[in-house]
Amino acid sequence: FARLALAAVGQPFAVGALARPVPLLWVAKKGETEVHLLGSFHMLKEGDYPMDPSIELAYANAEALVFEIAPAEMKSPDLSRGLMQAARFEEGGSLRAVLPEATRKKLEAFMGEAAVLGSDSMKPWFITLNMTVSMILQAGFNPALGMDVHFMQRAEADAKPTRGLETVADQIAALSGAPMDEQVL
């Protein structure tokens, strides 16, 4: 019995490299059961394909795939709706109110004053996430080419069963759960 589990390990996004990296692929065995654990990058470039042969072999031998979030949940409007709900301050809260002046000035220098004012209802973790994703996209990485999307599409085409380790709510809680003093470091 073989499974391929895709999970974000370490950095949530790829960060370009000169040499082709060794895949983050581990094998755990007990008796007849074999589980392959693959660290997944959510954004890649076309040049990152084809996948390493060890990854392709693990996929070919997998009876099922386990993702961070089940593919059906990834397609749900609850993901973006829940994320936006968690990202907004409650009535009366604002980004200006929680950011130290020096941090706000750095953010304005980076984003522009109008963009910061337009983001005033958003919590710091969400601003950080958006800035990070924006820089990764500018570097040429593409979420449609991420390993998770790649294997979700292949599993669907190959009729391989899939499931998730966490729910959308779990992911949103992990992203938004840091205390405010940690969000504004």
For each feature predicted by the language model, list its residue ranges.
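Bacterial N-terminal signal peptides that target proteins for export
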Residues: 1-3
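Structured, acidic catalytic/metal-binding patches in enzyme active sites
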Residues: 5, 13-18, 22-185
